[in-house]
Amino acid sequence: MNLLSILFGKKDNSALENALKNNPFLVDVRTPSEFASGSIKGAQNIPLSEIKNHISKFKNKSEIIVFCRSGNRSAMAKGTLEKNGISNVVNGGSLENVVKTMQKIKNID
């Protein structure tokens, strides 16, 4: 166990793992230029600054996962969506975290 894990604990990805198993609506909230540099296949790019303008895209989705570069913008996006009545949102954190969790699930199944 490394020092960061000891100090801050291990990230609990159980909500992310469950959401990934249910064909989620994947939303990359990074900027278009960041998105163009690579993302998850099938993810939609809705930058954090545009989330409020696209609330209708989130309605009637059973599972929503938002992610970004570090997890900060996706946390803000989750908060914005919840303030607008969208409650089934999981903050996937970083793009790297979502990809690693997807790979873990693929290896388990």
Model-derived regions, located:
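Rhodanese-like catalytic fold shared by cysteine-dependent sulfurtransferases
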Residues: 2-24, 32-61, 72-109
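Short cysteine clusters
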Residues: 68
